[in-house]
Amino acid sequence: MAGLPDKDKLIRNFSRCLNWEEKYLYVIELGAQLPPLTEQQRQPDNLISGCQSQVWIAMSTSTEGQVVFAGDSDAAIVKGLVVVVFILYQGLTPQQIIDLDVRPFFADLALSQHLTPSRSQGLEAMIRAIRAKAAVLKAG
């Protein structure tokens, strides 16, 4: 996902936001950078249940064994949250994704306390789905 910040830069950029409104706008800007999904990726298997908005997450592995992400949402803020999650898992293998708890990163970004309960539940559903898909990729 060329052009997206890495984890450290993401945290730095969030810390530079003066208030929650700026963070919200930054998340929306991140979402706008997601390339569109193909029709093949926009299949029911990639639709994440537990999200109020429609969210698709497709995962595959590169020749180096790293997970490659593609995703989309019909809601701008949720699309941005998809990108944030992808950034946190970027460059990892399926096993590393299974082992990594990204929740502390959301605490570092001060995102968790500013999301509505339904968005927090959706974020949790995305994380669970990514870890489950990583387990399937690992199993081959």
Swiss-Prot record:
State the organism named in the record.
Answer: Yersinia enterocolitica serotype O:8 / biotype 1B (strain NCTC 13174 / 8081)
List the coiled-coil residues: none
Q: Which family does it belong to?
A: Belongs to the SufE family.
**UniProt protein name:** Cysteine desulfuration protein SufE
- Residues of the active site are C51
Localisation per UniProt entry: Cytoplasm
The question of whether Cytoplasm is a record keyword is answered with yes
Protein role: Participates in cysteine desulfuration mediated by SufS. Cysteine desulfuration mobilizes sulfur from L-cysteine to yield L-alanine and constitutes an essential step in sulfur metabolism for biosynthesis of a variety of sulfur-containing biomolecules. Functions as a sulfur acceptor for SufS, by mediating the direct transfer of the sulfur atom from the S-sulfanylcysteine of SufS, an intermediate product of cysteine desulfuration process.
Q: How does it assemble?
A: Homodimer. Interacts with SufS.
State which pathway it belongs to.
Answer: Cofactor biosynthesis; iron-sulfur cluster biosynthesis
Q: Could you mention a single GO BP entry for this protein?
A: iron-sulfur cluster assembly
